[in-house]
Amino acid sequence: MSGESSSGSTEHCIKVVPTHGGRYVQYNVYGQLFEVSRKYVPPIRPIGRGACGIVCAAVNSVTGEKVAIKKIGNAFDNIIDAKRTLREIKLLRHMDHENVITIKDIVRPPQRDIFNDVYIVYELMDTDLQRILRSNQTLTSDQCRFLVYQLLRGLKYVHSANILHRDLRPSNVLLNSKNELKIGDFGLARTTSDTDFMTEYVVTRWYRAPELLLNCSEYTAAIDIWSVGCILGEIMTGQPLFPGKDYVHQLRLITELVGSPDNSSLGFLRSDNARRYVRQLPRYPKQQFAARFPKMPTTAIDLLERMLVFDPNRRISVDEALGHAYLSPHHDVAKEPVCSTPFSFDFEHPSCTEEHIKELIYKESVKFNPDH
Protein backbone atom coordinates (compact mmCIF):
# COMPACT_ATOMS: atom_id res chain seq x y z
CA MET A 1 0.00 0.00 0.00
CA SER A 2 1.18 3.49 -0.66
CA GLY A 3 -0.21 6.97 -0.44
CA GLU A 4 -3.32 8.31 1.28
CA SER A 5 -5.79 11.00 0.40
CA SER A 6 -9.04 12.19 1.87
CA SER A 7 -12.49 12.49 0.37
CA GLY A 8 -15.99 13.33 1.40
CA SER A 9 -17.77 16.19 3.09
CA THR A 10 -16.94 17.76 6.42
CA GLU A 11 -19.38 15.27 7.91
CA HIS A 12 -17.59 12.24 6.49
CA CYS A 13 -13.86 12.67 5.90
CA ILE A 14 -13.09 9.29 4.38
CA LYS A 15 -9.48 8.30 3.74
CA VAL A 16 -8.52 6.63 0.47
CA VAL A 17 -5.82 3.94 0.59
CA PRO A 18 -4.60 2.30 -2.65
CA THR A 19 -4.21 -1.50 -2.42
CA HIS A 20 -3.08 -4.38 -4.64
CA GLY A 21 -0.61 -2.27 -6.58
CA GLY A 22 -3.12 0.54 -7.00
CA ARG A 23 -5.72 -1.61 -8.80
CA TYR A 24 -8.06 -1.27 -5.81
CA VAL A 25 -8.79 1.42 -3.25
CA GLN A 26 -9.81 1.04 0.35
CA TYR A 27 -12.10 3.36 2.29
CA ASN A 28 -12.99 3.28 5.97
CA VAL A 29 -16.74 3.81 6.26
CA TYR A 30 -18.40 3.67 9.68
CA GLY A 31 -15.38 1.71 10.89
CA GLN A 32 -15.79 -0.85 8.11
CA LEU A 33 -13.29 -1.37 5.32
CA PHE A 34 -14.74 -0.81 1.87
CA GLU A 35 -12.42 -2.15 -0.86
CA VAL A 36 -13.43 -1.60 -4.47
CA SER A 37 -11.90 -1.22 -7.94
CA ARG A 38 -9.99 2.04 -8.36
CA LYS A 39 -12.50 3.23 -10.98
CA TYR A 40 -14.91 3.98 -8.11
CA VAL A 41 -13.80 7.39 -6.92
CA PRO A 42 -14.83 10.02 -4.35
CA PRO A 43 -17.01 11.51 -3.19
CA ILE A 44 -17.72 8.31 -1.26
CA ARG A 45 -20.86 8.86 0.76
CA PRO A 46 -22.57 6.39 3.12
CA ILE A 47 -26.25 6.27 2.15
CA GLY A 48 -27.57 3.29 4.04
CA ARG A 49 -26.98 0.49 6.48
CA GLY A 50 -29.01 -2.68 6.78
CA ALA A 51 -28.89 -6.26 7.92
CA CYS A 52 -27.06 -7.24 4.75
CA GLY A 53 -24.35 -4.58 4.94
CA ILE A 54 -23.46 -1.00 4.18
CA VAL A 55 -24.30 1.00 1.04
CA CYS A 56 -22.20 3.90 -0.29
CA ALA A 57 -22.65 6.30 -3.16
CA ALA A 58 -19.64 6.75 -5.44
CA VAL A 59 -18.75 7.75 -8.98
CA ASN A 60 -17.61 5.41 -11.74
CA SER A 61 -14.68 7.40 -13.16
CA VAL A 62 -14.83 5.49 -16.47
CA THR A 63 -18.46 6.30 -17.27
CA GLY A 64 -18.98 9.34 -15.03
CA GLU A 65 -22.06 7.62 -13.63
CA LYS A 66 -23.12 7.93 -10.00
CA VAL A 67 -23.62 4.50 -8.46
CA ALA A 68 -24.60 2.80 -5.21
CA ILE A 69 -22.21 0.13 -3.94
CA LYS A 70 -23.51 -2.43 -1.45
CA LYS A 71 -20.94 -4.27 0.63
CA ILE A 72 -22.11 -7.66 1.83
CA GLY A 73 -19.58 -8.54 4.49
CA ASN A 74 -18.77 -12.16 5.33
CA ALA A 75 -21.11 -13.14 2.52
CA PHE A 76 -20.33 -16.85 2.79
CA ASP A 77 -20.60 -17.35 6.55
CA ASN A 78 -23.88 -19.21 6.14
CA ILE A 79 -25.64 -20.84 3.23
CA ILE A 80 -28.85 -18.79 3.51
CA ASP A 81 -27.09 -15.42 3.17
CA ALA A 82 -24.82 -16.74 0.43
CA LYS A 83 -27.80 -18.03 -1.59
CA ARG A 84 -29.63 -14.75 -1.13
CA THR A 85 -26.68 -12.78 -2.53
CA LEU A 86 -26.24 -15.06 -5.55
CA ARG A 87 -29.99 -15.07 -6.20
CA GLU A 88 -30.19 -11.29 -6.34
CA ILE A 89 -27.17 -11.04 -8.65
CA LYS A 90 -28.53 -13.60 -11.12
CA LEU A 91 -32.07 -12.20 -11.04
CA LEU A 92 -31.01 -8.63 -11.69
CA ARG A 93 -28.66 -9.69 -14.48
CA HIS A 94 -31.58 -11.51 -16.11
CA MET A 95 -34.02 -8.61 -15.94
CA ASP A 96 -33.98 -5.39 -17.94
CA HIS A 97 -36.83 -3.00 -17.21
CA GLU A 98 -37.23 0.70 -16.41
CA ASN A 99 -38.99 -0.07 -13.13
CA VAL A 100 -36.54 -2.69 -11.86
CA ILE A 101 -33.20 -1.65 -10.33
CA THR A 102 -30.21 -2.27 -12.59
CA ILE A 103 -27.07 -4.06 -11.48
CA LYS A 104 -24.05 -2.30 -12.98
CA ASP A 105 -21.12 -4.33 -11.71
CA ILE A 106 -19.87 -6.95 -9.31
CA VAL A 107 -16.46 -5.83 -8.05
CA ARG A 108 -14.08 -8.59 -9.07
CA PRO A 109 -12.22 -9.83 -5.97
CA PRO A 110 -8.45 -9.19 -6.06
CA GLN A 111 -7.82 -12.86 -5.25
CA ARG A 112 -10.06 -15.63 -6.49
CA ASP A 113 -9.62 -17.97 -3.53
CA ILE A 114 -9.36 -15.50 -0.67
CA PHE A 115 -12.40 -13.26 -0.49
CA ASN A 116 -15.30 -13.07 1.95
CA ASP A 117 -16.97 -9.80 1.00
CA VAL A 118 -19.10 -9.12 -2.07
CA TYR A 119 -19.56 -5.65 -3.55
CA ILE A 120 -22.61 -5.19 -5.77
CA VAL A 121 -22.85 -1.97 -7.79
CA TYR A 122 -26.30 -0.60 -8.68
CA GLU A 123 -27.57 2.50 -10.41
CA LEU A 124 -27.93 5.24 -7.80
CA MET A 125 -31.41 6.28 -6.73
CA ASP A 126 -32.12 9.33 -4.58
CA THR A 127 -34.32 7.81 -1.91
CA ASP A 128 -36.88 5.13 -1.14
CA LEU A 129 -40.59 5.24 -0.41
CA GLN A 130 -40.13 4.51 3.30
CA ARG A 131 -37.97 7.62 3.72
CA ILE A 132 -40.53 9.71 1.84
CA LEU A 133 -43.34 8.44 4.07
CA ARG A 134 -41.35 8.93 7.28
CA SER A 135 -40.42 12.48 6.30
CA ASN A 136 -44.11 13.44 6.27
CA GLN A 137 -43.77 14.78 2.73
CA THR A 138 -47.19 15.14 1.18
CA LEU A 139 -47.55 13.26 -2.08
CA THR A 140 -50.06 14.72 -4.50
CA SER A 141 -52.88 12.56 -5.84
CA ASP A 142 -51.15 12.45 -9.23
CA GLN A 143 -47.81 11.45 -7.67
CA CYS A 144 -49.49 8.61 -5.77
CA ARG A 145 -51.17 7.36 -8.92
CA PHE A 146 -47.92 7.49 -10.92
CA LEU A 147 -46.01 5.62 -8.19
CA VAL A 148 -48.60 2.84 -8.03
CA TYR A 149 -48.65 2.61 -11.82
CA GLN A 150 -44.86 2.26 -12.03
CA LEU A 151 -44.83 -0.31 -9.23
CA LEU A 152 -47.40 -2.44 -11.05
CA ARG A 153 -45.67 -1.91 -14.40
CA GLY A 154 -42.42 -3.25 -12.92
CA LEU A 155 -44.25 -6.07 -11.18
CA LYS A 156 -45.90 -7.15 -14.44
CA TYR A 157 -42.43 -7.60 -15.93
CA VAL A 158 -41.14 -9.43 -12.84
CA HIS A 159 -44.11 -11.82 -12.82
CA SER A 160 -43.76 -12.41 -16.56
CA ALA A 161 -40.24 -13.70 -15.85
CA ASN A 162 -41.88 -16.27 -13.56
CA ILE A 163 -40.51 -14.49 -10.49
CA LEU A 164 -42.34 -13.60 -7.29
CA HIS A 165 -40.69 -10.76 -5.38
CA ARG A 166 -42.10 -11.86 -1.99
CA ASP A 167 -40.78 -8.86 -0.06
CA LEU A 168 -42.37 -5.73 -1.52
CA ARG A 169 -42.42 -2.93 1.05
CA PRO A 170 -41.74 0.82 1.01
CA SER A 171 -38.00 0.46 1.75
CA ASN A 172 -37.63 -1.72 -1.37
CA VAL A 173 -39.38 0.82 -3.59
CA LEU A 174 -36.61 3.13 -4.84
CA LEU A 175 -37.20 6.62 -6.22
CA ASN A 176 -35.32 9.47 -7.85
CA SER A 177 -35.98 13.20 -7.98
CA LYS A 178 -38.06 12.79 -11.16
CA ASN A 179 -40.53 10.57 -9.26
CA GLU A 180 -39.28 7.57 -11.26
CA LEU A 181 -39.64 4.27 -9.42
CA LYS A 182 -37.60 1.08 -9.42
CA ILE A 183 -38.22 -2.14 -7.51
CA GLY A 184 -35.19 -3.29 -5.52
CA ASP A 185 -34.00 -6.07 -3.21
CA PHE A 186 -34.71 -9.39 -4.90
CA GLY A 187 -32.89 -11.45 -2.28
CA LEU A 188 -36.05 -13.31 -1.27
CA ALA A 189 -37.46 -13.77 -4.77
CA ARG A 190 -38.55 -17.20 -6.00
CA THR A 191 -40.29 -18.72 -8.99
CA THR A 192 -42.39 -21.18 -7.04
CA SER A 193 -43.43 -21.81 -3.47
CA ASP A 194 -40.64 -22.73 -1.10
CA THR A 195 -41.12 -24.12 2.36
CA ASP A 196 -37.83 -22.55 3.49
CA PHE A 197 -39.33 -19.08 3.04
CA MET A 198 -40.90 -19.11 6.48
CA THR A 199 -37.65 -19.83 8.27
CA GLU A 200 -35.33 -17.95 5.93
CA TYR A 201 -35.90 -14.41 7.11
CA VAL A 202 -38.26 -12.46 9.29
CA VAL A 203 -39.74 -10.43 6.47
CA THR A 204 -41.54 -7.26 7.47
CA ARG A 205 -44.92 -8.77 8.25
CA TRP A 206 -46.90 -5.56 7.75
CA TYR A 207 -46.93 -6.12 3.98
CA ARG A 208 -47.35 -9.88 3.97
CA ALA A 209 -50.39 -11.53 2.47
CA PRO A 210 -52.71 -13.63 4.69
CA GLU A 211 -51.65 -16.86 2.96
CA LEU A 212 -48.04 -16.27 4.05
CA LEU A 213 -49.06 -15.37 7.59
CA LEU A 214 -50.97 -18.66 7.68
CA ASN A 215 -47.93 -20.65 6.52
CA CYS A 216 -49.56 -21.62 3.23
CA SER A 217 -46.92 -23.52 1.27
CA GLU A 218 -48.64 -23.07 -2.10
CA TYR A 219 -48.76 -19.38 -2.91
CA THR A 220 -48.87 -17.40 -6.13
CA ALA A 221 -48.11 -13.98 -7.62
CA ALA A 222 -51.11 -12.74 -5.62
CA ILE A 223 -48.79 -12.32 -2.60
CA ASP A 224 -47.10 -9.38 -4.36
CA ILE A 225 -50.45 -7.80 -5.25
CA TRP A 226 -51.41 -7.81 -1.56
CA SER A 227 -48.16 -5.97 -0.78
CA VAL A 228 -48.91 -3.37 -3.47
CA GLY A 229 -52.33 -2.86 -1.88
CA CYS A 230 -50.68 -2.23 1.49
CA ILE A 231 -48.32 0.27 -0.15
CA LEU A 232 -51.18 2.00 -2.02
CA GLY A 233 -53.10 2.44 1.23
CA GLU A 234 -50.02 3.75 3.01
CA ILE A 235 -49.04 6.36 0.43
CA MET A 236 -52.64 7.61 0.38
CA THR A 237 -53.00 7.86 4.17
CA GLY A 238 -49.41 8.31 5.34
CA GLN A 239 -49.82 5.42 7.78
CA PRO A 240 -49.17 1.66 7.47
CA LEU A 241 -52.48 -0.17 7.02
CA PHE A 242 -51.59 -3.22 9.11
CA PRO A 243 -48.81 -2.45 11.64
CA GLY A 244 -49.11 -5.79 13.44
CA LYS A 245 -47.07 -6.42 16.59
CA ASP A 246 -47.04 -10.17 15.92
CA TYR A 247 -48.70 -12.70 13.60
CA VAL A 248 -51.95 -12.90 15.59
CA HIS A 249 -52.26 -9.13 15.80
CA GLN A 250 -51.42 -8.86 12.09
CA LEU A 251 -54.25 -11.20 11.10
CA ARG A 252 -56.64 -9.35 13.39
CA LEU A 253 -55.82 -5.98 11.79
CA ILE A 254 -56.35 -7.50 8.34
CA THR A 255 -59.71 -9.08 9.17
CA GLU A 256 -60.88 -5.92 10.93
CA LEU A 257 -60.56 -4.10 7.59
CA VAL A 258 -61.31 -6.70 4.89
CA GLY A 259 -63.67 -8.80 7.01
CA SER A 260 -63.35 -12.34 8.32
CA PRO A 261 -63.26 -14.89 5.50
CA ASP A 262 -66.19 -17.26 5.06
CA ASN A 263 -65.70 -20.95 4.30
CA SER A 264 -65.76 -20.34 0.55
CA SER A 265 -62.75 -18.03 0.93
CA LEU A 266 -60.56 -20.61 2.66
CA GLY A 267 -60.09 -23.02 -0.24
CA PHE A 268 -56.49 -21.85 -0.69
CA LEU A 269 -55.60 -23.31 2.72
CA ARG A 270 -54.70 -26.97 2.27
CA SER A 271 -54.20 -27.54 5.97
CA ASP A 272 -57.22 -28.45 8.12
CA ASN A 273 -55.40 -26.96 11.10
CA ALA A 274 -54.97 -23.64 9.31
CA ARG A 275 -58.65 -23.53 8.35
CA ARG A 276 -59.66 -24.39 11.93
CA TYR A 277 -57.36 -21.66 13.23
CA VAL A 278 -58.91 -19.01 10.97
CA ARG A 279 -62.46 -20.09 11.87
CA GLN A 280 -61.80 -19.71 15.60
CA LEU A 281 -60.45 -16.16 15.24
CA PRO A 282 -62.74 -13.29 16.35
CA ARG A 283 -65.23 -12.48 13.58
CA TYR A 284 -65.26 -9.03 11.97
CA PRO A 285 -67.50 -7.60 9.25
CA LYS A 286 -65.82 -5.91 6.30
CA GLN A 287 -65.39 -2.17 6.80
CA GLN A 288 -66.71 0.31 4.29
CA PHE A 289 -63.51 1.37 2.53
CA ALA A 290 -65.03 4.74 1.53
CA ALA A 291 -65.60 5.54 5.21
CA ARG A 292 -62.16 4.25 6.26
CA PHE A 293 -60.37 6.17 3.47
CA PRO A 294 -62.47 9.33 3.01
CA LYS A 295 -59.74 11.30 1.17
CA MET A 296 -58.98 8.64 -1.44
CA PRO A 297 -60.38 8.94 -4.97
CA THR A 298 -63.27 6.56 -5.60
CA THR A 299 -61.35 4.66 -8.26
CA ALA A 300 -58.35 4.25 -5.94
CA ILE A 301 -60.63 2.83 -3.25
CA ASP A 302 -62.05 0.34 -5.74
CA LEU A 303 -58.55 -0.81 -6.77
CA LEU A 304 -57.51 -1.10 -3.12
CA GLU A 305 -60.56 -3.26 -2.36
CA ARG A 306 -59.70 -5.58 -5.24
CA MET A 307 -56.11 -5.93 -4.03
CA LEU A 308 -56.84 -6.47 -0.35
CA VAL A 309 -58.91 -9.62 -0.72
CA PHE A 310 -58.29 -12.36 1.86
CA ASP A 311 -58.63 -15.17 -0.68
CA PRO A 312 -55.66 -14.93 -3.10
CA ASN A 313 -57.68 -16.64 -5.84
CA ARG A 314 -60.08 -13.69 -5.84
CA ARG A 315 -57.42 -10.98 -5.71
CA ILE A 316 -56.94 -8.80 -8.79
CA SER A 317 -54.00 -9.76 -11.05
CA VAL A 318 -51.24 -7.37 -12.07
CA ASP A 319 -52.61 -7.10 -15.64
CA GLU A 320 -56.12 -6.41 -14.37
CA ALA A 321 -54.75 -3.82 -11.94
CA LEU A 322 -52.87 -2.00 -14.70
CA GLY A 323 -56.10 -1.86 -16.71
CA HIS A 324 -58.09 -0.48 -13.76
CA ALA A 325 -59.82 2.88 -14.16
CA TYR A 326 -57.66 4.47 -11.43
CA LEU A 327 -54.56 4.03 -13.60
CA SER A 328 -56.15 4.95 -16.95
CA PRO A 329 -54.15 8.22 -17.30
CA HIS A 330 -50.95 6.14 -17.50
CA HIS A 331 -52.00 2.72 -18.76
CA ASP A 332 -50.77 1.75 -22.22
CA VAL A 333 -50.32 -1.98 -22.73
CA ALA A 334 -47.90 -1.31 -25.60
CA LYS A 335 -45.55 0.38 -23.11
CA GLU A 336 -45.81 -2.31 -20.43
CA PRO A 337 -43.29 -4.90 -21.64
CA VAL A 338 -42.87 -8.44 -20.41
CA CYS A 339 -39.70 -10.48 -19.98
CA SER A 340 -38.81 -12.47 -23.09
CA THR A 341 -37.48 -15.52 -21.21
CA PRO A 342 -38.56 -16.96 -17.85
CA PHE A 343 -35.92 -17.00 -15.14
CA SER A 344 -34.58 -20.34 -13.96
CA PHE A 345 -33.45 -21.04 -10.41
CA ASP A 346 -31.62 -24.19 -11.50
CA PHE A 347 -28.42 -22.91 -9.89
CA GLU A 348 -29.99 -23.38 -6.44
CA HIS A 349 -29.29 -27.02 -5.69
CA PRO A 350 -30.15 -28.32 -2.21
CA SER A 351 -26.62 -29.72 -1.99
CA CYS A 352 -25.06 -26.34 -2.90
CA THR A 353 -22.25 -25.39 -0.51
CA GLU A 354 -20.93 -21.97 0.48
CA GLU A 355 -17.76 -22.66 -1.53
CA HIS A 356 -19.77 -23.50 -4.64
CA ILE A 357 -21.77 -20.28 -4.32
CA LYS A 358 -18.53 -18.36 -3.81
CA GLU A 359 -17.23 -19.73 -7.11
CA LEU A 360 -20.48 -18.82 -8.90
CA ILE A 361 -20.34 -15.25 -7.58
CA TYR A 362 -16.72 -14.96 -8.65
CA LYS A 363 -17.74 -16.04 -12.16
CA GLU A 364 -20.47 -13.38 -12.17
CA SER A 365 -17.85 -10.74 -11.31
CA VAL A 366 -15.68 -11.94 -14.21
CA LYS A 367 -18.60 -11.44 -16.62
CA PHE A 368 -18.60 -7.76 -15.66
CA ASN A 369 -14.80 -7.49 -15.60
CA PRO A 370 -13.36 -9.91 -18.19
CA ASP A 371 -10.19 -7.85 -18.78
CA HIS A 372 -9.30 -7.49 -15.10
Swiss-Prot record:
Which compartments does it reside in?
A: Nucleus; Cell membrane
Activity regulation remarks: Activated by threonine and tyrosine phosphorylation.
EC no. given is 2.7.11.24
**Main location group:** nucleus
Annotated stretches, region: IBR5 binding? 210-372
A Pfam family annotated for this chain is: Pkinase
Which residues hold ATP? 47-55, 70
Q: Which tissues is this chain's protein expressed in?
A: Expressed in seedlings, roots, stems, leaves, flowers and siliques, mostly around stomata.
Q: Which reaction does it catalyse?
A: L-seryl-[protein] + ATP = O-phospho-L-seryl-[protein] + ADP + H(+); L-threonyl-[protein] + ATP = O-phospho-L-threonyl-[protein] + ADP + H(+)
Q: Does the keyword Manganese apply?
A: no
- EC class of this enzyme? transferase
Q: Which Gene3D superfamilies match?
A: Phosphorylase Kinase, domain 1, Transferase(Phosphotransferase) domain 1
Q: Which CDD domains match?
A: STKc_TEY_MAPK (cd07858)
Where the record places motif TXY is 199-201
- For the keyword Kinase, the answer is yes
Effect of gene disruption? Lethal in homozygous plants. Abolished CO(2)-mediated stomatal closure. Increased stomatal opening.
Record's bilayer topology term = Peripheral membrane protein
Subunit field text: Interacts with IBR5/SKIP33. Binds to HT1.
Q: What does this protein do?
A: Negative regulator of the auxin transduction signaling pathway. Involved in stomatal movement regulation by phosphorylating and repressing HT1 and HT1-mediated GHR1 phosphorylation. Required for CO(2)-mediated stomatal movements (e.g. closure).
What is recorded about the protein's domains?
The TXY motif contains the threonine and tyrosine residues whose phosphorylation activates the MAP kinases.
The family line of this record is:
Belongs to the protein kinase superfamily. CMGC Ser/Thr protein kinase family. MAP kinase subfamily.
Protein known as:
Mitogen-activated protein kinase 12
Q: Which organism is it from?
A: Arabidopsis thaliana
